[in-house]
């Protein structure tokens, strides 16, 4: 495992290994054990798309592992504009021990990983969000005591979260149901890859336009914002189309009685989810947010340690 670009690229064993390491690092950190796995190492963090949770979790995680996080905004680095991605990768590999990148175009991450001889971590693209899903799987395990045989239902936009959740569920031995409106389905190539992963795992992938069908008996119920960065002009239209996909108390009743609710945040209460659900007793969103730190520490320790 040289990079973390997509969970589709990893084996089930590699995914489970990252989750086990994340849980171990979390437990030991809470017990006061310090880790210096990355002492003397520097992680360059490229952000062309801003994020509270991503920056804080990677900076704190790198520091807790004894390394140094170097923040690079779009003002500091012009990825693919002016200087080529090839030249950028070749310069950074001489000075850094790893690169984390959060950006719009997935191809930029693929190019960076191809050209740089140091590990590259995908911290989000418009296509995929693998680090978030590792945190989601970790959180599911903490609350359910297992992953194998559980069902996750995702209700909403067929976006990067839906894509990575399909990959993650397949690798973890979970069933997955995705409910999206017509014309807002998941990317066709990602779906084809995910179907291959589910065939190997022997688990079920359901793709539907019916949120009730998707959520039926689900152990984990997941949603995400209807309007991602760069889609602000479509806000009113999207809200109208997606309102039947709101995760509210009525829809949530169709899930398993002990289902947990997840959201990668930021959340917009009253739109993709109601306060009743997101602030209710079955919501685990802040455990999930915290686990970004621990899951990503496992990724950094594995790739850079």
Predicted features, each with a name:
Residues 42-43, 47-95:
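Active-site cofactor/substrate anionic-group-binding motifs, chiefly glycine-
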Residues 195-276:
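Rossmann-like adenosine-cofactor binding region
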Residues 65, 95, 115-116, 172, ...:
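Short, structured coil segments at secondary-structure junctions
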Residues 48-60, 144-223:
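Glycine-rich phosphate/diphosphate-binding loop of Rossmann-like nucleotide-binding domains
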Residues 1-56, 60:
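Positively charged, low-complexity intrinsically disordered leader regions
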Residues 258-259, 265-305:
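Adenosine-phosphate binding glycine-rich loop
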Residues 35, 90, 97-168, 263:
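Anion-binding alpha/beta catalytic cores of soluble intermediary-metabolism enzymes, centered on
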